[in-house]
């Protein structure tokens, strides 16, 4: 469960993202139930320290490529002990440091918002 102080930040970025993308946050407590909640036609990105690290501009290009493919984009953040997800299409790293999974959610949402602002040519990214 998401706890303060992260709740306010998550809600803030969900509101900001609403005009750019459909965002649905789903919490699953048990690792074995994660795969069942991923849409069938989804491009699934597992957040993993060993994944691809993007700067914000490259991440915005990644988002645009996924949008053009017509597939749903699904990001999966594991719990405190990580997550094995054999069906994941791609792995993304938010950086080399370990983050609490609740903070990782905030960072991911902020980067999604930043990426959409970059794609729209709107001021935010600097």
Residue ranges and their predicted role:
Residues 8-13, 58-62, 88-91, 106-107:
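Short, glycine/charged-enriched secondary-structure capping and boundary segments
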Residues 8, 54-57, 98-103:
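Residues at secondary-structure transition points
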Residues 1-17:
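N-terminal beta1-alpha1 ligand-phosphate binding loop
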Residues 78:
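Rossmann-fold NAD(P)-binding glycine/threonine-rich loop
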Residues 1-4, 50, 98:
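Short histidine/acidic/glycine/proline-rich micro-motifs that form metal-
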Residues 81, 85-126:
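Structured adenosyl-cofactor binding patch, chiefly the S-adenosyl-L-methionine
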Residues 13-16, 62, 66, 115:
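Conserved short hydrophobic interaction patches
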Residues 20-74:
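S-adenosyl-L-methionine/SAH cofactor-binding core of RNA-modifying enzymes
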């Amino acid at each position: 469960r998401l706890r303060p102080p992260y709740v306010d930040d998550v809600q803030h970025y969900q509101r900001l993202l609403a005009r750019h993308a459909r965002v649905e946050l789903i919490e699953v407590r048990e690792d074995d139930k994660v795969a069942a909640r991923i849409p069938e036609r989804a491009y699934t990105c597992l957040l993993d320290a060993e994944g691809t690290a993007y700067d914000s501009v490259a991440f915005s290009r990644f988002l645009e490529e996924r949008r053009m493919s017509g597939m749903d984009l699904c990001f999966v953040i594991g719990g405190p002990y990580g997550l094995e997800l054999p069906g994941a299409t791609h792995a993304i790293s938010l950086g080399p440091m370990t983050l609490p999974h609740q903070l990782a959610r905030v960072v991911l949402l902020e980067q999604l918002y930043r990426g959409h602002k970059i794609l729209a040519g709107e001021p935010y990214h600097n």
